[in-house]
Amino acid sequence: MQKLNRSFKISNEIKKKISWIICYQLCDPRLFNILISVSSVNLSRDFSYAKIYVSILNNKNISFKEILTILQNSSKHIRYLLAKGIFLRIIPTLHFCHDSSYVNGTKITNLINNVLYNK
């Protein structure tokens, strides 16, 4: 139980710090006017690897894959900035993934609404 609680606290702290870094410290002109939200962080048992799920609201003509590639290419810099803001013995290696739960939730809501209103 103690280990799960620590893992939960560390993943929440990493989530906050990475959100801050992406919004305010990552100066990539391709990411301007794109809202990137960190949904969740999954850590490995030894905290050496972190899978970061991001939701992307995009009003430019750039695909999710390209945005994830930009984030993945910036992961070493993000990890460096994370190390400055969080005090861990090992700063995890970052891997960015697209969180499609919002899109899936919207599809399910639309399906439910279609069934309810088309009786």
UniProtKB/Swiss-Prot annotation:
An annotated Gene Ontology molecular function: ribosomal small subunit binding
Main location (coarse class): cytoplasm
InterPro entries in alphabetical order: KH_dom-like_a/b, RbfA, RbfA_dom_sf, Ribosome-bd_factorA_CS
HAMAP family: RbfA (MF_00003)
Family named by the database record: Belongs to the RbfA family.
Subunit structure: Monomer. Binds 30S ribosomal subunits, but not 50S ribosomal subunits or 70S ribosomes.
Name assigned to this protein: Ribosome-binding factor A
